[in-house]
Amino acid sequence: MNLRPLHDRVIVKRLDQETKTASGIVIPDAAAEKPDQGEVLAIGPGKRDDKGAPIALDVKVGDRVLFGKYAGQTVKVDGQELLVMREEDIMAVVNAK
């Protein structure tokens, strides 16, 4: 991927959504909503404070994150759909068990 986010921007790849419910019902692609979880692929250097020092981001590359349904801007890079969003659009980091 040849995309480097600036400031507090984060590049996220949506994770595939389950196409089958717990009871075994298959959800067709046309009825499935876009997933609201993704994996962080790249992060920017962060915002700057009043003195010009960078403020580090709370997320890191590889984190699994939750975000709003309409968060971010969709871009296509190397045939892959990615989201570019601000860190503040990310609601939570999903911790692995």
Curated annotation (Swiss-Prot):
Q: Does the keyword Cytoplasm apply?
A: yes
Instruction: Extract the GO molecular function terms from the UniProt entry.
Output: ATP binding; metal ion binding; protein folding chaperone; protein-folding chaperone binding; unfolded protein binding
Q: Which GO terms describe its biological process?
A: chaperone cofactor-dependent protein refolding
Main site of residence? cytoplasm
GO CC annotations, alphabetized: cytoplasm
The subcellular location is:
Cytoplasm
| Recorded superkingdom | Bacteria
- Keywords for this entry? Chaperone, Cytoplasm
Q: Which Pfam families match?
A: Cpn10 (PF00166)
Q: Name the job this protein performs.
A: Together with the chaperonin GroEL, plays an essential role in assisting protein folding. The GroEL-GroES system forms a nano-cage that allows encapsulation of the non-native substrate proteins and provides a physical environment optimized to promote and accelerate protein folding. GroES binds to the apical surface of the GroEL ring, thereby capping the opening of the GroEL channel.
Q: Which PANTHER family match?
A: 10 KDA HEAT SHOCK PROTEIN (PTHR10772), CO-CHAPERONIN GROES (PTHR10772:SF58)
Assigned protein family: Belongs to the GroES chaperonin family.
Q: How does it assemble?
A: Heptamer of 7 subunits arranged in a ring. Interacts with the chaperonin GroEL.
Q: Cross-referenced NCBIfam families, in alphabetical order?
A: PRK00364.1-2 (NF001527), PRK00364.1-5 (NF001529), PRK00364.2-2 (NF001531), PRK00364.2-4 (NF001533), PRK00364.2-5 (NF001534)
Protein name per the record: Co-chaperonin GroES
Organism encoding this protein: Burkholderia cepacia
